[in-house]
Amino acid sequence: MSGLPDHLRRPVRGMRDWLPPQYYALRHMEEVLCKVAESFGYRRVETPVVEHFEVLAKKAGQDVINEIYYFKDKAGRDLGLRFDMTVPVARVLSYNLELPRPVRWYYFTKVFRYDEPQHGRYREFYQFGVELVGSSSPRADAEVIQLLIASLEAAGASNFYVRINDRRAVDKLLEHLGVAPYRDIIYKALDKKLKLPREDVIKIMTGGGVSKEIAEEIYNTATEITIQEAVELLYKLDKALGASYEKIVKYLEASVPMERLKFDMSIVRGLDYYTGIVFEAFVGEYKLAVGGGGRYDDLLELYSGVKTPALGFAIGVERLMEAVGIQNVERPLDYYIYIFDDDAYKYAAAVAKKLRTEGYSVVVELGEKGLKDAFEYALKVGARHIIIIGRKELEKGVIKVRDLEKRIEVEKPLSQFLA
């Protein structure tokens, strides 16, 4: 038996095929999440998968740039596949400056990152997210977090929480400790705090030139506290920052269950475009990180030249599906119609048309199976009913309908399907 070698019959590394049960699970999640975004007044947007490489790399940081699928087209242009939707949205808004602000957009779409594939993590994957553009109000920060929590609840996540931080708080801490010049290496270490042992995180900082004493203090400060305790901490670091954060907390207390929220100064997010509040969502017993976001008040100015405050979040859809246990959704076939010869085909077509207009899914046998094989096939594809139209049925003016779940059979007048 010839054909393609095995590695060519499989998806490219880091990609996946979606068979019907998995794809219907994905579509179920899409319907659930998009309904939440729409209920908050957000409207759906889509952009090209391919962007100019310069657009993608503008504020990505070297680690993210290394993950971009980069290529030259036939005209020699440097292009890349989008790694998130925040950057493309910023580009779109850069030439749509006349849109009324704030803009509330959401998306459910594919993005691409050339990193190391892991369990539940692919190089091509779906993101659901929102972008609120044109507001610096603390109410905007609270709204986006509300929407994130509502999305997780609607998706079926019962055991989840959101860790919140503010990059400006970390910067103030580093200034206070006299290590602001080491910001990049400290951010890199903090971003690993939830994944690596303490000594490894300390080693990243000391390896970058931070003294062990200061590294220990940073590690100890970047710990989990309540949202209310964080207000006091931020006031100590910077009064204006504390006052702004206190307002966000007030709005959150009025709108979300506060037990879902924690403050953690180790949450800094890997993307370089974040400028203020940042947050990540964790779901399930194993605290699976399913998404996050934050404020990026400088990003749009890079593209449009106009200072524009903005924030948003993105959820890794496959990660969320894994965390809430939605991997397969079966969609049974309603009716499978079996006929014995071509003389009955016009009646089968009429019955199928009538049932389809009523919203049922119907398959008509292609004439390649005997009755026994047709029954076996109908059971394998999950058909709920099989309809038999033979000579005896036509002589009586009926069709025979067998319920494959209840194992009962009834006859129905053929005339009711021919009107």
Curated annotation (Swiss-Prot):
Subcellular location: Cytoplasm
SUPFAM superfamilies for the chain: Class II aaRS ABD-related (SSF52954), Class II aaRS and biotin synthetases (SSF55681)
Keyword flag Acetylation: no
E.C. designation(s): 6.1.1.21
Highest taxon listed in the record's lineage: Archaea
Cellular-component GO terms for this entry: cytoplasm
Transmembrane segments: none
PANTHER family named in the record: HISTIDINE--TRNA LIGASE, MITOCHONDRIAL-RELATED, HISTIDYL-TRNA SYNTHETASE
UniProt protein name: Histidine--tRNA ligase
Species of the source: Pyrobaculum aerophilum (strain ATCC 51768 / DSM 7523 / JCM 9630 / CIP 104966 / NBRC 100827 / IM2)
Lineage, highest ranks first: Archaea, Thermoproteota, Thermoprotei, Thermoproteales, Thermoproteaceae
